[in-house]
Amino acid sequence: MWGWKCLLFWAVLVTATLCTARPAPTLPEQAQPWGVPVEVESLLVHPGDLLQLRCRLRDDVQSINWLRDGVQLVESNRTRITGEEVEVRDSIPADSGLYACVTSSPSGSDTTYFSVNVSDALPSSEDDDDDDDSSSEEKETDNTKPNRRPVAPYWTSPEKMEKKLHAVPAAKTVKFKCPSSGTPNPTLRWLKNGKEFKPDHRIGGYKVRYATWSIIMDSVVPSDKGNYTCIVENEYGSINHTYQLDVVERSPHRPILQAGLPANKTVALGSNVEFMCKVYSDPQPHIQWLKHIEVNGSKIGPDNLPYVQILKTAGVNTTDKEMEVLHLRNVSFEDAGEYTCLAGNSIGLSHHSAWLTVLEALEERPAVMTSPLYLEIIIYCTGAFLISCMLGSVIIYKMKSGTKKSDFHSQMAVHKLAKSIPLRRQVTVSADSSASMNSGVLLVRPSRLSSSGTPMLAGVSEYELPEDPRWELPRDRLVLGKPLGEGCFGQVVLAEAIGLDKDKPNRVTKVAVKMLKSDATEKDLSDLISEMEMMKMIGKHKNIINLLGACTQDGPLYVIVEYASKGNLREYLQARRPPGLEYCYNPSHNPEEQLSSKDLVSCAYQVARGMEYLASKKCIHRDLAARNVLVTEDNVMKIADFGLARDIHHIDYYKKTTNGRLPVKWMAPEALFDRIYTHQSDVWSFGVLLWEIFTLGGSPYPGVPVEELFKLLKEGHRMDKPSNCTNELYMMMRDCWHAVPSQRPTFKQLVEDLDRIVALTSNQEYLDLSIPLDQYSPSFPDTRSSTCSSGEDSVFSHEPLPEEPCLPRHPTQLANSGLKRR
């Protein structure tokens, strides 16, 4: 009889707990039995920390039950329940709530409550405003207390200062604390490597929070390495403490997946399942979740490749944290099987797989524990059953994984996995592949294609590439024409493609074809394949050069892309400069058409739209400039070369490129000095591209030698406003050139601002020819011969052209070189 009363009491208590409101993790008054005050222990946990809860137990406890917000708490890969204790690893804000530990015993039941708040604030990047306020109040209180005895400075929280060596990746925020006290209140100052540390000693400066005795440095770079010493002193003494900072420089690599994740799962029918996949990547990764499925009763196709279904893929508004977790609700027997986490970036692809086993749900029968022996029997039987299931799952997984191929292709909702080509070295299987990547075949197989009649490229053996039916175009439907130029890996020729549109098989389309040069190497082949695979992954957009097809079989590799008839944006702008201007190298030249202000803003708007799309696909361009934007017959701007696997820092800064311009003039300071490439560094380059547009193809930083440019950028100098540029657009350029990357606008914000400016700009606002021209940067600076060249800036100019006269240099250009101090 007493047992039934206990059970009834427990049911009433659980029902009351279920009524608890989620937004406020507090216990309602009606949940407090018989008016007895209920104690709730409050816990504040930072994201990523270990959450530990321990229940108070009586000696005669027979059962323990854990609830969160009135719902039964179950174990997962992060949550471990061991009787009276609960541990949650890598806590996240979703773990916040009201936890309850309900214990039953012959003498009654007891409940312990924990109110858990997992703060969204990261301790390394936030300003701890609450701490500042409270500390300030304490300081004021300390100062106002009368008759306080003098005390030399001392540490108030020495346990928080035990970690002296801090190794962090570049671009992270670093915060050092020296919490201390004394009477009178001591002062705080910071040294770097034993010398006084001032904000202007680093790009972006730093913040000192005197209320919390801390220093904060945003977006750290390798030059921030060193020893940082805090000195706390008053008239009665001085103490100091030194932290060592090591900034780890990021290097490009394909995504790295944490070993053991995702982990195999064995759950009951109707349960919820969570797969976790930790991805580490410097170039931002594109993550997908796949499930291996059966098609017509078979998991393997005729070509011995498995079928998969895409369950989750990254969108414009999804974050990497959201993509790292796959949730399955109310699982059924059909959900059992193999699941794969696939991550890719501009360097390559990686994947891990795990198995889900679904078991028949066990009926829950209410029973009263009559003896501890009965409870032990249930525990032993349950443990033996679970161990057997786990062993069975491991055996099945080993048998299945031995027959799987590791080549993945994931662009259709349900499709066969095509052979994925690594984006660096194709001819060997990577030795660092994970255990779940049992690749046993060469992804690019050596073969002799003697039937093709094509001469073998120097330094490159011939290879058989896997055919992709969605992109493959027969060679007899491609007619090659005149050369258009030379690219990074080879040459580009004009061609006519027949039947690119499957619905119109006889339509002829003008296209551009990228191919290798005769002296190409294996690395050139690797890079061209890398660019093709990246274009497939990124997809299509109006303002980027889109992939149309490829010829990979029975001959050399041809990559077919859209053709832009009006050349690159820089040449397009120069050809449309108003006649009679001093900086025009041919004053008698009549432009093809005159551009209005609205036309120029439209150019910028279209490029921003293309970059916004690339950013949404986690693609970092690294070399955005007017020369890499192409113009179609309909004046549509298309961003090119976004799929190149380039390493800009292998370029000699003192060597001219083919068009006489160096990438350094478009590179952000963090990319130039510390090799950190992000979407924010692309925004800096976009600001330089804006300057090119409104100078009608001018050369950035005219007359400035490389060594001087480095110095001026570090000192905060920026280029002047072009004459035909509004103040609003110039401020947009300056925002793009902010020294702190996080303070620059995003491409989404730039698109919104330029869209508004386009709508407000009149079609009749042509360039004002009466404005003085000394602020324009000449397209061809005066470096054409020994009689009018400057040795300092010859690295920034064009090679001499026979029909171009030597232009006089403007005095104002020599005076300030078109630069302002920010």
UniProtKB/Swiss-Prot annotation:
The entry's comment on post-translational modification says: Autophosphorylated. Binding of FGF family members together with heparan sulfate proteoglycan or heparin promotes receptor dimerization and autophosphorylation on tyrosine residues. Autophosphorylation occurs in trans between the two FGFR molecules present in the dimer and proceeds in a highly ordered manner. Initial autophosphorylation at Tyr-653 increases the kinase activity by a factor of 50 to 100. After this, Tyr-583 becomes phosphorylated, followed by phosphorylation of Tyr-463, Tyr-766, Tyr-583 and Tyr-585. Ubiquitinated. FGFR1 is rapidly ubiquitinated by NEDD4 after autophosphorylation, leading to internalization and lysosomal degradation. CBL is recruited to activated FGFR1 via FRS2 and GRB2, and mediates ubiquitination and subsequent degradation of FGFR1.
Note how its activity is modulated.
Present in an inactive conformation in the absence of bound ligand. Ligand binding leads to dimerization and activation by sequential autophosphorylation on tyrosine residues.
Main localisation: membrane
Disulfide-bond pairs as recorded: 55-101, 178-230, 277-341
Tissue specificity of this protein? Widely expressed.
The annotated regions of Polar residues compositional bias extend over 782-792
Site positions per UniProt: Mediates interaction with PLCG1 and SHB: 766
Q: Catalytic activity, per the record? A: L-tyrosyl-[protein] + ATP = O-phospho-L-tyrosyl-[protein] + ADP + H(+)
Protein name (database record): Fibroblast growth factor receptor 1
Q: Which organism was this protein described from?
A: Mus musculus (Mouse)
User: What gene name is given for the protein in this entry?
Assistant: Fgfr1
